């Protein structure tokens, strides 16, 4: 039963990240700004670092295969690391039982750190793919916009969900 539960959670996470990346996006210059990171954060917060890694890796990679296949392999690793990192930090935060204001500040630090790793990963990827860091610098703006939007969406969803009993369950 536990394995089926994990498979269902991972399938839902992959689906949410795929939809929020491939469908809920806006073109900014030559880049797509999407809300996938917000759902990676939600999945990683609710279900832990492995669920964040799986949802980030597979959901984002599938979205890239549908929208921008040249970066799909890189996305698999970048978004997986982002989900894993956020999940590890948020698990640490939850286990410390901080006051709500401190928990929010710590979660903000986790979001910013994870987004920074994502932005660095795509900067290095695009420098490699295009052979020039100048071209990769252009994408920093759209990745920054995407990060800010995703952090805002995460906080909206987090604050809506945090009073629901789902957050208080230990068996997830």
What role is predicted for each listed range?
Residues 1-172:
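Loop-helix junctions at membrane interfaces
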């Amino acid at each position: 039963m536990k394995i089926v539960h994990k498979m269902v959670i991972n399938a839902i996470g992959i689906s949410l990240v795929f939809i929020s990346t491939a469908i809920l996006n806006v073109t900014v210059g030559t880049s797509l700004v999407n809300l996938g990171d917000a759902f990676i954060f939600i999945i990683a917060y609710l279900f832990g670092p492995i669920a964040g890694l799986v949802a980030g890796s597979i959901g984002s990679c599938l979205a890239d295969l549908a929208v921008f296949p040249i970066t799909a392999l890189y996305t698999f690793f970048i978004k997986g690391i982002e989900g894993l990192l956020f999940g590890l930090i948020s698990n640490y935060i939850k286990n410390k039982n901080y006051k709500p204001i401190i928990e929010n500040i710590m979660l903000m630090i986790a979001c910013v750190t994870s987004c920074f790793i994502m932005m660095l990963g795509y900067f290095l990827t695009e420098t490699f793919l295009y052979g020039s860091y100048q071209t990769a610098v252009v994408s920093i703006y759209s990745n920054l916009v995407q990060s800010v939007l995703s952090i805002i969406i995460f906080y909206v969803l987090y604050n809506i969900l945090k009073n629901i009993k789902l957050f208080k369950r230990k068996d997830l």
